[in-house]
């Protein structure tokens, strides 16, 4: 299994949050809250970097 070191957490129009690889068209996971999305991304990439897109459109980096 390939391990990735970078994931993006972004809000969806319906209010849920998605966890995606950079440049991916489809989400790796969809969850109800930003907190859950960050936890999921951390499970996918324990030592990786997570970029969280905030509701204002700016990104913040975790890890």
Please give the residue ranges for each predicted region.
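Absolute protein N-terminus
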Residues: 1-2, 63
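Amphipathic, Lys/Arg-enriched alpha-helical "gate/interface" segment within cytosolic domains
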Residues: 2-4, 40, 53-54
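Short aromatic-glycine-(Arg/Gly/Cys) micro-motifs in beta-strand/loop hairpins
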Residues: 2-26
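Short amphipathic beta-strand/extended segments with alternating polar/hydrophobic composition
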Residues: 27-35, 60-63
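A short, charged, amphipathic alpha-helix used as a generic interaction element across diverse proteins
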Residues: 31-47
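Short, mixed-charge low-complexity intrinsically disordered segments
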Residues: 47-63
């Amino acid at each position: 299994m390939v391990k990735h070191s970078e994931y993006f957490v972004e809000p969806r129009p319906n209010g849920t949050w998605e966890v995606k690889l950079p440049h991916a068209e489809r989400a790796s996971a969809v969850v109800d809250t930003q907190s859950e999305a960050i936890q999921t991304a951390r499970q996918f990439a324990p030592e990786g970097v997570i970029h969280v897109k905030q509701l204002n459109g700016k990104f913040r980096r975790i890890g």
